[in-house]
Every structure is written in C-alpha cells, then in structure tokens.
C-alpha cells in the first residue's frame, strides 16, 4: 500500500509538470499571424503614446505584470474590477499601490487593437499586458526581445488569492527564493527580475522600518549607506503624507540599466529585499557580475521575463478572450 501511495504521488507530480509544460508549449511568437498580424506594432504604438503622456506608464505597467503573473499566473486577472459580490485581486491590500497608469496602458492598447476590424476580440488582455511590458522595458532603454503569445484571460479573480503570493519589502533571501520557486523561477531569475527596480518608485511608508525602527539594537538599518540614509530621511520624514513616493533607483530612475546592482554594492538598495541580494553571500556574486556587465544582466533579464510569462498560463478552454479587460464576459 505504501508503494502504491508513493507511485500515485509521483504520477501526480509528473502530470502537473506535464500540464504546466503543455500550456507553455502552446505559446508561440506568431500566434496571431493569421488573425491580427500587426498586433505587436499596434500595442507598441499605444504604449508609446501613453508614455508621452506620463513616464509613470513604464514602471506601472512593469509592476502590474509581475503582480498579475505571481497570483494564479499571467492571465490578466489583476485587471478585473470588483463587484458587489466579488472583491477582486486589484483590491487586495498588496495591490492597492498599483498605479492606475499601468491598468490604463492595457485598456488603451486593447482599444487600439479592437479598433482594427479583423483584430477585434481576437487578442487576449493577458497577451496585451505581456507585449506592453516588453515595450515599456525597451522604451526605457532596456533590451528588445521576442515575446511568446497565445495566453487566454483568466476566468476568476479574488482578493483572497493574493495573500502570501507577492514578495514583501522586508523579505530575506530565503523568503524570496521560496516565493519565486513556487512559480518555477530560480534564484538567478529572482535576482534578475529584482533588477526591474531600476525603474519606478515606492511609498515612503515601505522604508520607514529601515529608517526609524529597524530593530532593538539599531533604529536605522546598518546596511544602508549613511549618505543614502540622510537623503532618504530628508525625502521621507516620519510625519510625511503616506502617499508620497520616492525613486527606487536614486541615480538613473528613468533608465532601464544595471545601475540597480551598482547601487546595491554601495548600500543603496531601497528595500531590505533589495539590499539582501548584496549582503547575502549566496547572491552577492551575481549582483557583482551584473553590476560590472550590463549586457549579461540584459540577457539574464530577458530569459527570466520569458520564464515569468509562462507562469500559470491559461490556454484553450481554461480561459477566454475578454471583451473588456476589467470585466468577465
């Protein structure tokens, strides 16, 4: 009987592995070649137009993608609006700080795609978000890369499903590695994807603990560069409006580059979960490598983004193509 149980367990693990890989295998770069051949250019044009209106488009879209993929996979479930009978993912406390410009980027790109008669209701919101994310990275000076397409939009979205699925600013390396592993991502993927913090901003309240109440021994986190502490305290005094935000990268906040890793070498990681990548000996060599070689970082980032885009993919009857990205059909 024990042998049977072990066998059944192995078969279950194997079936789950095959199911995940089967979904990923159905993704391909030319998925819309026969239905909406110009979809990537249509989306890129919409993204460019949105960026011209506000730079926030770039970090907001990138962050939206991560938050979508880490909760039940890359299925645009984070786009769904809550109703009287359902509190959706976007209204979980961990998602309330997602900037509206990220959502608006997808909505505007969807409108542009659907304005082309043969493309209308043929392209999923999940794929539009994937393409838009690639585009904001590239338009911020980051690498251009081919995306895999063919995702369907998710059929459910609940705030309760978000709990415990997203990394916290206070996470240590073990917690980060464990959370990424749940999504089939390696420690190297985690370090590469953390490099997205080269763009964007965070609310002051997210770093108060490092500046004013770190632990019983030190009010200030001793791993923070002293000059950076002075800078952060000037930008984030204790009585500041909690809505005030600061740049994740104090040096090149509007440029996708490897300066994030150089900042870590200097003790200028904004979150504990950033700085730990340098202070922990297991991840430090990778930080040093990418700080010294931006091309290697770009290559690693592309590889990890493609892997991220395969997480929890819905294909076929497991999803659909939403007419409105913010509501189920």
Swiss-Prot record:
Binding annotation for Ca(2+) 1: 68, 71, 73, 75, 77
Enzyme class label: oxidoreductase
Disulfide bond entries: 36-119, 69-74, 125-325, 204-236
Cellular localization per UniProt: Secreted
Active site: 67 (proton acceptor)
Binding-site residues for substrate, renumbered to this chain: 167
Protein's name according to its UniProt entry: Peroxidase 51
Organism: Arabidopsis thaliana (Mouse-ear cress)
Taxonomic lineage of the native organism: Eukaryota, Viridiplantae, Streptophyta, Embryophyta, Tracheophyta
Protein's gene: PER51
């Amino acid at each position: 009987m024990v042998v049977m149980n072990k066998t059944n367990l192995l078969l279950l693990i194997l079936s789950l592995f095959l199911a995940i890989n089967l979904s990923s295998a159905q993704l391909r770069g030319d998925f819309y070649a026969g239905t909406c051949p110009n979809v990537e250019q249509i989306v890129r044009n919409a993204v460019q137009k949105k960026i011209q209106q506000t730079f926030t488009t770039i970090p907001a879209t990138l962050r939206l993608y991560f938050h979508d993929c880490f909760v039940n996979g890359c299925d645009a479930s984070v786009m769904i609006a809550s109703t009287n009978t359902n509190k959706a993912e976007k209204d979980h406390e961990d998602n309330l700080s997602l900037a509206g410009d990220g959502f608006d980027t997808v909505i505007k790109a969807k409108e542009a795609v659907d304005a082309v008669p043969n493309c209308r209701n043929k392209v999923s919101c999940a794929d539009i978000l994937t393409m838009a994310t690639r585009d904001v990275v590239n338009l911020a000076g980051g690498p251009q890369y081919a995306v895999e397409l063919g995702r369907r939009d998710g059929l459910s979205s609940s705030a309760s499903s978000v709990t415990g699925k997203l990394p916290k600013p206070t996470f240590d390396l073990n917690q980060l590695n464990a959370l990424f592993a749940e999504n089939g991502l390696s420690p190297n993927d985690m370090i590469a994807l953390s490099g997205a913090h080269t763009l964007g901003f965070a609310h002051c309240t997210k770093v108060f603990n490092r500046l004013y109440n770190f632990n019983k021994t030190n009010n200030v986190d001793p791993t923070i560069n002293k000059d950076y502490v002075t800078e952060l305290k000037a930008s984030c005094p204790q009585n500041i409006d909690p809505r005030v935000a600061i740049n994740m990268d104090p040096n090149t906040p509007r440029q996708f580059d490897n300066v994030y890793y150089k900042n870590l070498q200097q003790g200028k990681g904004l979150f504990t979960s950033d700085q730990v990548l340098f202070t922990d000996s297991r991840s430090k060599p990778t930080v040093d490598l990418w700080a010294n070689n931006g091309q290697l970082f770009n290559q690693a980032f592309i590889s990890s983004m493609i892997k991220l885009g395969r997480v929890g993919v819905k294909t076929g009857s497991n999803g659909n193509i939403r007419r409105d990205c913010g509501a189920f059909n």
